[in-house]
A protein has these predicted regions:
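Bacterial N-terminal signal peptides that target proteins for export
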Residues: 1-9
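N-terminal alpha-helical modules
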Residues: 3, 20-130
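Sequence termini and other peripheral, non-core segments
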Residues: 12-14
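N-terminal signal peptide c-region/cleavage motif recognized by signal peptidases
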Residues: 16-18
């Protein structure tokens, strides 16, 4: 048990160092591969924020789920999120396909996915604040 308690801060430190190095490298990426890695990192951050916002909202609706309308609201949220995931995927695939060939073509897909994730995060947070 004592060993694992010591490893947690070490792992956090290693991860923080890695994240800082990635952020620094993304300030001025100079190759296509670096540009794509940076956009993947930005997408990962946006996805984490989106998932956290969704879990918070779904959890709040679950906790308040004593009334029929609250249970229905949670069920509708789950359905809406599944539909949104499918919409986002198709929308970004369409953009990717429309770009034809090119080394930065994947960037358009990643950027589209990130933009949608950021917008959806704001929508979920607004849902919670209303």
């Amino acid at each position: 048990m004592a060993v694992s308690k010591k490893l947690v801060p070490l792992a956090a430190l290693v991860w923080a160092s890695y994240a800082m190095a990635q952020d620094e490298a993304c300030k001025a990426p100079d190759t296509t591969a670096a540009i794509l890695r940076c956009e993947e990192l930005r997408l990962r951050h946006a996805e984490q924020a989106l998932n956290a916002a969704y879990r918070r909202l779904a959890g709040e609706l679950q906790q308040r789920g004593s009334e029929a309308h609250e249970r229905e609201a949670r069920a509708l949220l789950v359905k809406a999120q599944r539909n949104w995931v499918a919409f986002r995927e198709q929308d970004c695939k369409a953009l990717f396909t429309a770009r034809g060939d090119g080394s930065l073509r994947p960037w358009y897909y990643l950027n589209c996915m990130r933009s949608h994730a950021q917008l959806r995060t704001k929508q979920l947070e607004t849902f919670r604040s209303d």
